[in-house]
Amino acid sequence: MASYLTLFISAVVVNNYVLTRFLGLCIFFGVSKNLNASVGMGMAVTSVITMSSILAWVVYHFVLIPFNLTFLKTVVFVLLIASFVQLLETIIKKQAPALYNMWGIYLLLIATNCIVLAVPILNADSNFNFLQSVVNAIGSGLGFAMAIILMASLREKLRLADVPKPLEGLGVAFILAGMLALAFLGFSGMISI
């Protein structure tokens, strides 16, 4: 049980995909202008990462390994992720049209988000068992959600600040992201998997 907790904390904080590995920055910068959209996107990315990792683990261990097709891992994982995101898009469009309109193109970008693909690939490369893969996926998704919510909170506070004209928009967003990354750098080396 302790190893699963360690893996979870490592995925959320120590090896945060956005702030330590710099993956998924397109959605991170694009959606973090609005806190509500960021919370929803964090939940969506977490669910997509988790479900994609579960599907990828099953396909990898019951199809690709037995038939010696592991070289197709990336292509198969991309197809699984794209299919799941398409399903999620259809559900959100029907059930929550306001959220669907708020996210815009970023919902489809989840399918091509490098975090969503990196987690199942790293799970496979790390030879994680099923439960380890699920724990790592949930932790990675929640780490992304935490990072984007922190960023959105800071960006909303900055709307009230007097930001120099050349730094408005993405300029100050990159500075904020760098400061967050430096803060999370302090956790590096605390947990090794």
From Swiss-Prot:
The keyword Cell membrane applies. GO terms for biological process: electron transport chain. Its EC number is 7.1.1.-. Keywords: Cell membrane, Electron transport, Membrane, NAD, Translocase, Transmembrane, Transmembrane helix, Transport. One of its GO terms (cellular component) is plasma membrane. It is a multi-pass membrane protein. It is an enzyme of class 7 (translocase). Pfam families: Rnf-Nqr (PF02508). The chain crosses the membrane at residues 11-31, 39-59, 62-82, 102-122, 134-154, 171-191. It comes from the Bacteria. Disulfide bonds: none annotated. Its main location: membrane. Belongs to the NqrDE/RnfAE family. HAMAP family: RsxA_RnfA (MF_00459). Part of a membrane-bound complex that couples electron transfer with translocation of ions across the membrane. Couples electron transfer from reduced ferredoxin to NAD(+) with translocation of H(+) out of the cell. Essential for energy conservation during autotrophic growth. Contributes to ATP synthesis during heterotrophic growth. The complex is composed of six subunits: RnfA, RnfB, RnfC, RnfD, RnfE and RnfG. This is Proton-translocating ferredoxin:NAD(+) oxidoreductase complex subunit A. It comes from Clostridium ljungdahlii (strain ATCC 55383 / DSM 13528 / PETC).
